[in-house]
A protein has these predicted regions:
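Extracellular beta-rich repeat passengers
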Residues: 1-46, 60-81, 86-87, 91-208, ...
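Active/ligand-binding-proximal structured segments within catalytic/core domains
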Residues: 57
Length: 448
């Protein structure tokens, strides 16, 4: 077909509903035509979408924030898989038509750093455990949840569920906010299991969150989240995955003089009354969110003095968090806000198992913490004590971009390789120096 003056291959719903599809690289780009669902959400109707290195897939329309019509997005329902097989120098790219169509097209308006929500993003639905279930026993067939943006149901009893893989994949200008309670992200992983493989993934300029985890146990390495309009990485509903090598870049909106992002990390669990002993109405114990991060760096563009005050990391609703070998460098923002007593109680404070901890964290913000958003939770002094245990400390960062300088590299990293998921690293943060920048040759440079 001809598309805005250039040729492209169409992807329509009927292509993916009942057959396996491979998108071949080295040729034309592909254009999304509406809501694309891989398979029919049943075991018998499972399909896969395989994408070769170097393939570009772009939206047919650029409806914009709030619009519910003309929405292009991809859903991988339970049982089906996406196999996005990008490679160094040849990533798989999902983007807006603005970037692909010729200047003669009606929606070829110039891209800029503040554009988001041109298309709906990617949604993966899995069969792993999640805790948003108050009407059936946890993990039973009836214990499922419905995704936002009419993205289907998810949840089950298989933490080893497999939704495919994403390697060297870039997702740009995606997401959609229909209203405050109904949103699509750059990528949503909904009860996705830990047999799914995620490595070298970038989201850029996404509406709502860059990446959000709704329960599940999926793990990821080499995440690069730039310029989300809400949070960069968000989790809720009992996510228990692991992440290593992650960069969050909070982009500054010079027009509105605010970050384009709300927080670098916003972490939830189930509700403000959630605690480790919580049960559903059937008396079944509820899972709580408890991810483990290592080698995370959070940075941002230079700010104007009238930028809104916020924090890099917000932990609330009884989430756990195991943060290791981290660098958090934002100014004039605070580094951490812990809300709700049930969240702080996970810190253990020497009285029990420590589900909320920071080990070898390097904090470089105008303040370590701010007062709690909702008035509950620990005092500033309690939070700062927690933040500076286990070899963690505040200091002046010497970063070049998101890569370490002498101050960060002076910290001796903890070795986490006893857990087979984690690589052994000698450095804290995501990148030991410019010569070790793992975003080169596949991701979009946010400084350009």
């Amino acid at each position: 077909m001809k598309d805005g003056g250039g040729a492209a291959c169409e992807l329509v719903a009927s292509n993916l509903a009942d057959k396996n599809i491979r998108l071949i690289g080295g040729g034309l780009p592909y254009v999304m035509k509406g809501k694309l669902v891989v398979g029919d959400g049943t075991d018998a109707g499972a399909q896969y979408l395989q994408i070769d290195p170097g393939v570009t897939i772009y939206s047919d329309s650029v409806a914009g924030e709030g619009a519910s019509t003309d929405l292009d997005y991809v859903i991988v329902p339970v049982y089906s898989k996406m196999l996005a097989n990008g490679a160094p120098g040849a990533p798989v790219t999902f983007t807006t038509s603005r970037e692909v169509r010729t200047s003669g097209s009606s929606d070829s308006s110039t891209l800029n750093d503040n554009i988001t929500a041109d298309w709906g993003g990617l949604v993966f639905n899995g069969l792993a455990y999640q805790n948003k279930c108050n009407f059936a026993d946890l993990g039973s067939a009836a214990c499922t949840a419905s995704g936002e943006g009419a993205s289907g149901t998810y949840g089950g009893t298989n933490d080893a569920d497999n939704s495919g893989n994403m390697f060297y994949t870039v997702v740009k200008y995606a997401g959609r906010k229909f209203n405050a309670e109904d949103e699509l992200n750059g990528i949503a992983f909904q009860a996705v299991g830990n047999k799914t493989e995620l490595d070298y993934i970038q989201t850029m300029n996404t509406s709502d969150d860059g990446i959000e985890f709704f329960g599940g146990s999926v793990n990821a390495k080499h995440l690069f989240v730039v310029g989300a309009s809400d949070d960069s990485i968000d989790w809720t509903d009992g996510w228990r995955g692991k992440v290593q090598h992650a960069i969050i870049w909070q982009r500054y909106d010079s027009t509105n003089q605010t970050y384009s992002i709300d927080r670098s990390i916003e972490a939830d669990n189930y509700g403000s009354d959630m605690d480790r002993g919580a049960t559903n109405s059937f008396g079944a114990p509820l899972l709580f969110s408890y991810p483990k991060f290592a080698n995370l760096t959070i940075v941002g563009d230079t700010l104007a003095t009238n930028d809104k005050t916020g924090t890099a990391i917000l932990l609330r609703e009884g989430t756990g968090f195991d943060g290791n070998n981290m660098v958090v460098a934002l100014d004039p923002h605070g580094c951490l806000d812990v809300d709700d007593d049930t969240t702080y109680d996970f810190n253990g404070d020497g009285t029990g198992e420590d589900y909320l901890s920071f080990k070898k964290a390097f904090w470089s913000c105008s303040s370590l913490t701010l007062t709690t958003e909702d008035g509950s939770g620990p005092t500033i002094a309690q939070t700062e004590t927690m933040m500076t245990k286990n070899g963690s400390a505040a200091g002046t960062n010497s970063l070049t971009g998101y890569c370490n300088g002498a101050n960060e590299n002076a910290v001796v990293a903890d070795d986490l390789s006893a857990d087979s998921f984690f690589d052994a690293t000698a450095h804290i943060g995501a990148c030991s120096g410019s010569s070790a920048d793992w975003t080169a040759n596949w991701a979009v440079d946010p400084s350009n």
